[in-house]
Amino acid sequence: MTGEKIRSVRKERKSGLDLLEPDEEPAATGPAKHRGSKIFSGGNHRISRSSSSPGDPDGAYPVHECVFRGDVRRLSSLIRTQNIAQKDVHGNTPLHLAVMMGHKECAHLLLAHNAPVKVKNAQGWSPLAEAISYGDRQMITALLRKLKQQSRESVEDKRPRLLKALKELGDFYLELHWDFQSWVPLLSRILPSDACKIYKQGINIRLDTTLIDFTDMKCQRGDLSFIFCGDAPPSESFVVLDNEQKVYQRIHHEESEMETEEEVDILMSSDVYSATLSTKSITFSRAQTGWLFREDKTERVGNFLADFYMVNGLVLESRKRREHLSEEDILRNKAIMESFSKGGSLIEQNFEPMRRQSLTPPSPNTISWEEYITAETGKAPHLGRELVCKESKKNFKATVAMSPDFPLGIESLLNVLEVIAPFKHFNKLREFVQMKLPPGFPVKLDIPVFPTITATVTFQEFRYDEFDESIFTIPSDYKGDPSRFPDL
């Protein structure tokens, strides 16, 4: 197993446990509020009433109730007519409950009907996070595979809209710079910077970068080009060129059985994180300049005149769970992280995860359905293994420079960023600019990319231009190497 692969997996606990995500929509608490949820469940699930229970007087959560009670027979009869993506008053979906309570038959039935895996409850935990806590290896593996499948399907569903938007957008050259910082001692000095060049022509995009992969642990550098060809079959759309070694690799989505098993080993031996950038109280105020006579700050960023704003009310909320870890796991993880903060690597640590067995199940649940569903919102009775959780909140101070002169609109930028989302730091940029920003285009902004790391992104140059089509093709003297970039 390569250090890069391990790094990628520990980075996000891989696909399902993003280190930093924007606020989700508030959990709706009744059937009528879940009309939009059907996109997650692979079908148009009709909401119907069933016989109510004392704790659920409206009968609003029949699927949740039969999962809670472990009633597989009733679940199988309800599942075709009910919304299996619905959240209850505590933000849990039926899949959350099945996993937390160890009702494996219910969980597998829900997964067979494409119940959403990435969705989070009110505490910020996905079903995969809850499965790691419970510790059943088979269930963790099933959820991980379904999560990857749903992620691929989501990309494929967006593809026609994305290609249409790219085709309507003019051809251009865009240059932006990344500078990473951290408030962790010693970490800032090893953090990278990067100058990215983006070429867009028709439905093709090329990104030249020196930073292909970056986590809060380590970065991978090189002279690299990422090419997206919109008219190629999905399996051949994405390719990465290593311009130093003159090799290329197509980005694959399927993983081998061994890779999946290794990923499960790392999930079961690592902390589970939930980090959310809360934007509920966000406000923008004009940045000021001058000592005696204060005035609004307006400066040139690259070729564009921009108004500077202070971003107020951004809060980074993070939670870390480790009830599934042994004392040995905790000490080992701490040693690895200390090595990273000093510039070390996984290879130097000789890190090779051991094959993990399922944990002993937690004590059987003694809470009734009525007690669970009538509990005060935000104070749900805990189900599953006893929590060992640390929580923290950090106010994120940021500035953003908005220019009315930038030729590209934010919506167009979002479409371009969606194409290059495999680069995780670009995905964080996309999430950030989806907020309601002041007027103009964000030519310079601060964004959090990991709980301890922020980046200043500067759009230095933009021009409409035409390019030789050859820059979107693989050079004839490059050789294919399917293992050059294990993280992709």
Swiss-Prot record:
GO biological process: protein retention in ER lumen
Region Disordered: start-end pairs: 1-60
A GO CC annotation given for this chain: endoplasmic reticulum membrane
Swiss-Prot/TrEMBL ANK repeat ranges: 58-87, 90-119, 123-152
A GO molecular-function descriptor: signaling receptor binding
Location in the cell: Endoplasmic reticulum membrane
Compositional bias of kind Low complexity: 41-59
Domain of life: Eukaryota
Keyword terms: ANK repeat, Chaperone, Endoplasmic reticulum, Membrane, Repeat
PANTHER family: ANKYRIN REPEAT DOMAIN-CONTAINING PROTEIN 13, ANKYRIN REPEAT DOMAIN-CONTAINING PROTEIN 13C
Function according to Swiss-Prot or TrEMBL: Acts as a molecular chaperone for G protein-coupled receptors, regulating their biogenesis and exit from the ER.
Protein name, as recorded: Ankyrin repeat domain-containing protein 13C
Record organism: Danio rerio (Zebrafish)
Taxonomic path: Eukaryota, Metazoa, Chordata, Craniata, Vertebrata
